[in-house]
Every structure is written in C-alpha cells, then in structure tokens.
C-alpha cells in the first residue's frame, strides 16, 4: 500500500480482528497509523508499512447502510481527495448520496466468499476447527463460571460466591475482611480476573505493603496467569514514557515508595484506572481529627477510580472506629458519621437472630417475627406464612431478602473459620534442647538467642566447616534425626533468615545425605518454581524444603503436613503465616508442628508465650496482633531474662486477656454478615459446576485439534502431563505457547496444585484463549472443498455447507455476550435448496469426507461461481429468521434481567443506603445502550464448505 493513500476519514477493516467492525483512519504519524473502530470504541495503532488492513470499497450493486440505519443500493462510486462517495437508490427509489465517513460502523463483509472466489481454499480440518472454536467461544461467554474456573486453586464455595457477587457489579466498591487463611488474595484475584475477562475493568492498580509485593506478583502470575508490572523507584525513574503507568494494564505498587514520591503520585492519578485494590488496608491510619499520609493517598485514589477492593483484617480485630474508616473510603457519602454508623449497626442484631432461626428450621420467636415484619413489611408476612405452610423455597427467599437488606452486606464480606468448614486439626510437638556453650558466651544484645546462629554466620569467613554453627547447634542434630524418622513424608522447614536456610541445606547434605532443596528471597521466581517442583515431585523429589521467612510468602505446600519451625518469628501474625503454608482448606491431614527450642533462652520463653498465652500453635489467633501491641513493651525485656515469677505472671495475664478478647469476638459475631459472605449455598453450586467442568474431556480434545492445526508437537511427560514444543511445521510464530523451547502442561487441577512448574490449562488460560483468537481472527478454515463418499448421493451431487455468525458488536463491558454470544448458525443446502443441517451433523459429514487438491478445487469453484453466489443468498434467507429469533429472545432476556436488577436495587435503596445512585444510573445507561446495540446485531458469512459427491 502506498503510504500516501491512507487518508483521515477512510474506512478500512482489520484482517485480524474483523469483529471490530468498520475502522476509520484517524491519523498517519511518521511510521504509525491510528485507526478508530467506533462500533466497539477501540483504537489500534499499526506499523505503516505492514498494517493488517483491507480498504472498504463497495461496488455498484452492493447494498450499503448509513450510520442512521437507512440503506441504499450503490449505482456509482466517485473518489474525492482519497475519500469515496457512494451514489445510489433507496428501497423507495429515492436518490441518495452517502460519503464513506457516514457508513454504518456495524457493516460486516463476506470475506469467506471473497477468499473462495480468489482461489484461497484451506485444508479440510481447519473448517471443523473454526466451527468448534465458534461453538466453544459461544458457550464460554454464556457460562456462569467464566473467570471463576480457571484459577490454579482449589474451588472453595465462599471464595467463588464472593468473587461472582462482586465481579458481576459495575465498578464494585467492597471490603474483603475474611479471617486469616480463608484466601482474601485469591478472592481478589478471582474478582480482578473475572472483571478483566468480562470487560468490566480494563486497567487495575494494586497497592500493597512493600513486603507483600513479591507474594502478589507470584499469586497473580501463578494462579491467574495475570502479567502484573511491578513498579518501584528504579523502574519509574528509568522509564522513557511521559507517564510510565499508562503502558501497563495491571500495575503493582508499594505504598511505602508511593507516599514519598510526589511525581509518581501525580503520574498515578493521571493514568486512569478502572479498579483499585489495596491489601492490608487496616494499616491505613484514620482518626476523626487526623489521617495518615497513606490513608490520604488511598482516599484521593478512591475518589477518582470507579471500582475499589480493600483487603483488610476482620472488623472485630480492627475495632469499630477503624472499621468505619475503611467503609468511609468506599462510600464517603454513605459513611460520613461515626456515631450514626454505631447506632445503625445495633439495629441489625435482631435481623441476624431471625435469619439464624430460619436456618435452624425451628419455630420462630416473637422477636424474629417482629424483626422480619419491620424489615420486609407485608412481603415478609406473606413469605412467613408460606414458610409456616412448609414451603422451603419461601424460607430460602426470605433469608435472601433479609441478607440483601443488611446494612453493610453489599459492601462488606467477611468469612470466619467458625463459619467455613474444611480446615485441618493441628498437633504440637515441642523439643526443648540444651543450650550449647558457644551460644552462652555470646555478648548480650537484642534477643541474642532468638537467632543466635546469625552471630556465627557473620564471623565465619575462613571456610573451615568445623567452625560453622551447625556443627554444634543441637537443633541441627535433632533435625537430622527427625527427618530420618519421617523419611516417608514430605517436610517443610521454615526459619527466619535466608542465610540460615542455605546453611541448613549444607548441613543436611554434608552430615546426613538427606535430599533437601532451599527457598529464599534471593532466588528468582523461576528458581523458586524449580525448587517447589523438586519438593512436590513424589517419586524423585526432595524430602525436605527449607524456606526463609520471606521466601515462602504466597506459596502453598498443602501436599505436606509436617512443618518444622526451626526458630520462631517475633510476631504472632508471622507465625500464623508460617503455619498457613500447610493449614489451608483442602488439607486432608492433621498438621504436625515440630518446634525445637533452646532451654533457658529467649526461644523457650517465646515458645511459651505463643503456646500458653496466645494458644497460637493449636488454633488461629485473631487476637494476636492486639495482644502483641498491648503486651509487647513488657514482653520483649522478659524474653532475654528476668525473674521466673514475673514471667509466669505475664503468661497468666496474657492468657486471661486472650480469653476475654475471644469471648468478646464471639459474642460480637455478625451472623448475618457471615451468612451473606458465605453465599447461603450458592458457592457450593459453583464448586460442583467447576468440578464437573474439570472432569469434562472437551478441552483436551479441542486442544489436540488446535495443536495439530498449528504444528505444535505434544508428547507425554508423566501421568496427566504433556510436553508441548514447536515443530518444524509450526504454522504461526504468534501461537501463544509461552516459551519457544516448549512448556509442560496439565489439565488436572490436583496435579497443577502440586506442580507449579506446569502450566494449568483451562478454557481461561492465555494459551487456550490466544489459540482460539488466532483461529477466529485469521481466515484459515473459512473456505474448504471436499469429496463426500456416500452411496446415497449421485456422483457429482453438490452440497453447500455454510456457517453464519450471528452476533452483536459491542463494548465488552456491556457483556451482551451473555444474552447474544457470537454463535455459528449452520446451513447445509442440497441442490433443491433444502436445509439438511438439522438432520446431518457436522461430525457425521466429517467421517465421510476426503480432501481435494487445491488446483482441482479452485477449477470447480470458478466453474460454479454464479450458481454458488445465488446459493449463498438462498442460505442466508434460511438463516435470517433464526438470527432474528435469537436477537428478539436476547433483547427480551436482556431487558428482563436489567429490569429485575433495577427493581431489586431500587427497592433495596429504600431500606439499605449502601446502594449508590451511580449504580442505578449505570444500570439504566447499560440497559439503553445494550438494547440499541442488540437492534444492530448482524449476521455474517463466516465459512463455506463445498461438498462434491464422488
């Protein structure tokens, strides 16, 4: 293409993304061409020399459509300054003129027929691949699991319920406040993933404490295949872009750096985001008369970013003032007065009790009846009468109605271990060991015997192994003996420092020959993956994985159930994080905790504090942070020494305070909130659906067809795993294999959870979606000619098989694909114009077909060109009623769904101020735009297969 021929206003169509509709040239700038696709609102930039575009040029006899909807038949085409002007007649015989700039953005093209008559005929298997890809894409867009089933995680009911409930809102603003170990990060990842897939969000900003950056990076990449850009001072400074944040879809930023860098803050505010995610939001300090810099920064971002997810500790841990501060970030108009919030919170207690009575299936108390009537009025009375008549559906509906009207039920989700089943038990094994003389001689310092080996690591420089700390530390001898005793089990060892982990690996190798691998923050993600895979391998893997404190963040080793705490962390939350590597939902064994510690040392006293005062080994300790804050100033001096009497008194006081706090937490449990957060059975249905999808063989069968078509070689790796490599015949270098050298994949969820070095292929995986995009965005498979061997057909009989796609071109955020997904409508015409598609399936035909050489196929097509062109019109006439029926049904269902949701939220707003006006306005706009775009739904000829009886 002569570069001078690109003119602003010209209409072009993308060769690789035909679904975008007509494009308009916006600008030609240097070596770049900018094209706007008004139908979807997308803008693309192409290299000028090889832009994958085709000029839209209609010929006399073609029908064209104006953007206002009227049509005309072209009689004459003229060109003026590079732009086309069409002259023609409308159906009413009016003469009209239509400049190409005013063409409808939704016009579709018969690219398949153009290719067929140009002699571009494809190999036979490609037609079937295109059909199956269209069918599967249509099913996926309608699936309630879309964005939920593809995570590398065990499907867990409460997580799936929260993810669907939140991700299906436009611009959700919610607080995720589950107890530790219930998977807030996974919930956030599921929400991000589903919002991105559905188009409800396009750009996401994740703010985290600096020490959690790596954990988030690993979680998002490993579990959700989300490529997150980690921003820090160096990356920001080195970027040549005017605004470095604008170049990424998902940005991960540390709050500590951001609050100190005003230039980065300005860039972040200007970048434009759809969703803000803030982890550890309870550390944002707010008081009525003063706020921290971090809180003020998040508050500014929350004012300009439509969607906000705050991940935080439970409301009971925070205290009501701090909890109110989080809610205030989500909706400052709704949560503006702390005292009013306190009063409102008290009003919901009777409703929670009524819901509990309904779920207990007993007779309802007078108080419960009063609460139900007070909240639901006559509607509640009617449902109550049905419940007492034995109507279980009415009972479920009554529970749902009460949950919906709960004060913060739409903005706050909080699950507790008490409410969620599936956690393992814990057993503690303590091993007091004698203090070696080398440690006793250490100079006094800050907790010298919590991590006494550190002093010797700093001193050891002469390379003499005999002087190394692990030669005399009794914990090492104990560890070797314990590992030998547990040789048939996988054992996870965690210590505070990376240097200690490396030393322990040396000690095990040199002193015992025990197979161990190490895991610490100095390793790259790839190195950690390999270490984790080596540990997970049942047959040839390491028995032991030795982790540093930071190195194991975000990892899941629940296939093991023996945990050695080689030392103890200085904070109970870190202790819970360590145990949480194994203590997760889905762990099938009792967790065995092995804790060696040196007698008469800070180690022993810290062990006693965690066990006797906090009970932190045998149970989770939601009060740990509060107790540490309260007792820390007295605890730390006593760790290093001090009288036994004072120490025993502190243990007793700590235990009493913990028990009092736990009783307070239990009495303050918001049962209504727990029920709403758990989903009251909806999450279990999602789990069952995902398990059913996992057991389906449709994906492996489809992917084998895809691999064969693109020249991807697959071979067995092990049970449930394959190795994929590009072959010499690889068709497209753009196939999203992920690694030019090859990758190992599995379709098995359990295998993927144990082996993080393997790609977990689901319908949502980038390789699968990218492969489907390649098929549908390219033209391969939209023309085919074959010989059909069927004795019932006379030789020379011609059957014409056509695939039409019925679709609405619309921005993804409207999610019209749920009601009118692009669907292949198949037509099989015989010589008499009868449609046989309902009687003869595509698979039945495939079994009877043989390939035809391209030269012969092309000769036949050219000879039959006029006949075929007429049959295309006959086929379209057969398909149009089916298309119109689909569109009418989609409009009806879409309008009904929107009206139902609008009615629900409008009624809810009257009793629950958590419903924002912006939500209702957004839904009304969505309804209008959606119906208008469904009216413009189009039918296009996607693929042609000519079958000649032989």
UniProtKB/Swiss-Prot annotation:
GO biological process: positive regulation of transcription by RNA polymerase II
Oligomeric form and interacting partners: Interacts with the RNAP. Has a higher affinity for the core RNAP than for the holoenzyme. Its ATPase activity is stimulated by binding to RNAP.
Gene: rapA
Motif, DEAH box: chain positions: 279-282
Gene Ontology molecular-function annotations: ATP binding; chromatin binding; DNA binding; helicase activity; hydrolase activity, acting on acid anhydrides; nucleosome array spacer activity
Binding, ATP: 178-185
Upper classification of the organism: Bacteria, Pseudomonadati, Pseudomonadota, Gammaproteobacteria, Pseudomonadales
PANTHER family with a match to the protein in the record: DNA ANNEALING HELICASE AND ENDONUCLEASE ZRANB3 FAMILY MEMBER, SWI_SNF-RELATED MATRIX-ASSOCIATED ACTIN-DEPENDENT REGULATOR OF CHROMATIN SUBFAMILY A-LIKE PROTEIN 1
Name assigned to this protein: RNA polymerase-associated protein RapA
UniProtKB keywords: Activator, ATP-binding, DNA-binding, Helicase, Hydrolase, Nucleotide-binding, Transcription, Transcription regulation
Biological source species: Pseudomonas aeruginosa (strain ATCC 15692 / DSM 22644 / CIP 104116 / JCM 14847 / LMG 12228 / 1C / PRS 101 / PAO1)
């Amino acid at each position: 293409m002569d570069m001078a021929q690109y003119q602003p206003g010209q209409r072009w169509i993308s060769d690789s993304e035909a679904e975008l509709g007509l494009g308009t040239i916006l600008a030609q700038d240097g070596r770049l061409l900018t094209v706007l696709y008004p139908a979807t609102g997308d803008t693309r930039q192409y290299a000028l020399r090889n832009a994958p575009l085709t000029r839209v040029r209609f010929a006399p006899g073609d029908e064209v459509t104006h953007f206002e909807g009227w049509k005309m038949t072209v009689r004459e085409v003229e060109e003026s300054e590079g732009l086309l002007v069409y002259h023609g007649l409308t159906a009413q015989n009016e003469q009209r003129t239509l400049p190409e700039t005013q063409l409808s953005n939704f016009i579709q093209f018969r690219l398949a027929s153009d290719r067929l008559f140009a002699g571009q005929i494809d190999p036979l298997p490609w037609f079937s691949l295109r059909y199956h890809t269209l069918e599967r894409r249509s099913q996926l867009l309608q699936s309630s699991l879309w964005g939920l089933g593809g995570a590398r995680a065990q499907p867990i009911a409460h997580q799936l319920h929260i993810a669907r409930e939140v991700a299906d809102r436009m611009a959700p603003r919610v607080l995720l406040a589950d107890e530790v170990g219930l998977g807030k990060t996974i919930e956030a990842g599921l929400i991000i993933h589903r919002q991105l897939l559905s188009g409800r969000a396009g750009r996401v900003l994740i703010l985290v404490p600096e020490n959690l950056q790596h954990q988030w990076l690993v979680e998002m990449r490993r579990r959700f295949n989300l490529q997150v850009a980690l921003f820090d001072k160096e990356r920001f400074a080195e970027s040549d872009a005017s605004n470095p944040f604008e170049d990424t879809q998902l940005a991960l930023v540390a709050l500590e750096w951001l609050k100190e860098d005003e230039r980065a803050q300005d860039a972040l505010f200007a970048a434009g985001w759809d969703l803000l995610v803030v982890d550890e939001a309870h550390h944002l300090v707010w008081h009525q008369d003063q706020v921290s810099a971090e809180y003020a920064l998040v508050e500014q971002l929350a004012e300009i970013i439509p969607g906000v997810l705050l991940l935080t500790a439970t409301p009971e841990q925070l205290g009501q003032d701090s909890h109110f501060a989080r809610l205030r970030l989500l909706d400052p108009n709704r949560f503006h007065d702390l005292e009013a919030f306190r009063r409102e919170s008290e009003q919901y207690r009777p409703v929670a009790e009524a819901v509990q009575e309904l779920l207990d299936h007993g007779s309802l108390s007078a108080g419960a009846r009063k609460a139900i009537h007070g909240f639901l009025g006559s509607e509640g009375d009617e449902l109550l009468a049905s419940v007492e008549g034995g109507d279980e559906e009415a009972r479920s509906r009554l529970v749902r109605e009460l949950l919906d009207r709960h004060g913060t039920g739409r903005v706050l989700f909080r699950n507790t271990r008490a409410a969620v089943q599936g956690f393992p038990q814990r057993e503690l094994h303590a091993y007091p060991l004698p203090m070696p003389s080398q440690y006793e001689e250490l100079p006094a310092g800050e907790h010298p015997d919590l991590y006494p080996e550190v002093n010797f690591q700093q001193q050891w420089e002469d390379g003499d192994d005999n002087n190394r700390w692990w030669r005399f530390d009794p914990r090492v001898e104990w560890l070797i003996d314990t590992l030998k005793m547990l040789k048939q089990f996988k054992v996870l060892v965690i210590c505070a420092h990376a240097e200690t982990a490396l030393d322990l690996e040396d000690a095990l190798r040199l002193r015992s020959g025990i197979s161990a691998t190490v895991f610490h923050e100095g390793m790259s993600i790839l190195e950690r993956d390999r270490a984790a895979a080596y540990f997970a391998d049942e047959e040839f893997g390491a028995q032991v994985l030795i982790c540093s404190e930071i190195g194991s963040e975000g990892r899941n080793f629940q296939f093991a159930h023996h945990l050695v705490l080689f030392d103890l962390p200085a904070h109970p939350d870190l202790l819970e994080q360590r145990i949480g590597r194994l203590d997760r939902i889905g762990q099938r064994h009792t967790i065995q905790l092995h804790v060696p510690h040196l007698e008469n040392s800070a180690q022993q006293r810290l062990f006693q504090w965690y066990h006797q005062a906090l009970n932190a080994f045998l149970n989770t300790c939601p009060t740990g942070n509060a107790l540490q804050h309260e007792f820390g100033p007295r605890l730390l001096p006593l760790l290093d020494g001090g009288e036994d009497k004072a120490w025993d008194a502190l243990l007793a006081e700590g235990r009493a305070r913990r028990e009092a706090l736990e009783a307070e937490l239990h009495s303050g449990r918001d049962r209504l909130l727990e029920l709403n957060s758990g989903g009251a059975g909806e999450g279990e249905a999602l789990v069952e659906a995902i398990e059913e999808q996992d057991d389906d063989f449709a994906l492996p069968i489809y992917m084998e067809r895809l691999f064969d078509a693109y020249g991807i070689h697959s071979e067995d790796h092990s049970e449930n795993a394959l190795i994929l490599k590009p072959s010499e015949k690889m068709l497209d270098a753009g196939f999203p294999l992920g690694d030019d050298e090859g990758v190992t994949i599995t379709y098995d969820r359990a295998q993927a959870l144990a082996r993080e070095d393997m790609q977990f292929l689901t319908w949502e995986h980038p390789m699968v979606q990218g492969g489907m995009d390649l098929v549908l965005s390219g033209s391969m498979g939209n023309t085919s000619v074959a010989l059909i061997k069927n004795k019932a057909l006379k030789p020379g009989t011609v059957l014409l098989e056509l695939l039409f796609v019925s679709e609405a071109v619309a921005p993804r955020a409207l999610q019209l694909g749920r009601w009118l997904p692009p669907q292949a409508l198949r037509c099989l015409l015989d010589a008499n114009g009868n449609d046989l598609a309902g009687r003869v399936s595509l698979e039945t035909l495939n079994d009877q077909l043989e390939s035809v050489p391209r030269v012969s196929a092309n000769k036949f097509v050219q000879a039959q060109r006029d006949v075929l062109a007429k049959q295309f019109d006959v086929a379209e006439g057969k398909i149009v009623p089916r298309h119109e029926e689909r569109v009418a049904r989609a409009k009806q269902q879409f309008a009904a769904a929107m009206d139902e949701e609008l009615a629900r939220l409008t009624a809810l707003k009257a009793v629950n101020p958590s419903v924002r006006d912006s939500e209702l306005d957004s839904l009304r706009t969505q309804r209008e735009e959606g119906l208008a775009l469904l009216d413009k739904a189009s039918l296009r000829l996607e693929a042609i297969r000519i079958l000649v009886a032989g």
